[in-house]
């Protein structure tokens, strides 16, 4: 077979170049130690910031209880919709 002969001939003629240390050095990056983690700085550190947080007013939204109590029915949360079955022919 002609194709097989050409393939074998090319395989025998192939001479790979040996890899040198310079090739390996060019293909990789040198390893370096990562930077040490920094301690996060909080905005307004100190006792005065804590006191300000403690004295801050809490915002609360109140719903009117009368309308919600009238509209609530405990049986409404688990209702199946009735499906009309097609007539049998």
Swiss-Prot record:
Transmembrane segments: none annotated. GO terms for cellular component: mitochondrial inner membrane; proton-transporting ATP synthase complex. GO terms for molecular function: proton-transporting ATP synthase activity, rotational mechanism. It is a peripheral membrane protein. It comes from the Eukaryota. It is found in: Mitochondrion inner membrane. Belongs to the ATPase h subunit family. Mitochondrial membrane ATP synthase (F(1)F(0) ATP synthase or Complex V) produces ATP from ADP in the presence of a proton gradient across the membrane which is generated by electron transport complexes of the respiratory chain. F-type ATP synthases consist of two structural domains, F(1) - containing the extramembraneous catalytic core, and F(0) - containing the membrane proton channel, linked together by a central stalk and a peripheral stalk. F-type ATP synthases have 2 components, the catalytic core F(1) and the membrane-embedded component F(0), linked together by a central stalk and a peripheral stalk. The central stalk, also called rotor shaft, is often seen as part of F(1). The peripheral stalk is seen as part of F(0). F(0) contains the membrane channel next to the rotor. F-type ATP synthases form dimers but each monomer functions independently in ATP generation. This is ATP synthase subunit H, mitochondrial. The lineage of its organism: Eukaryota, Fungi, Dikarya, Ascomycota, Saccharomycotina.
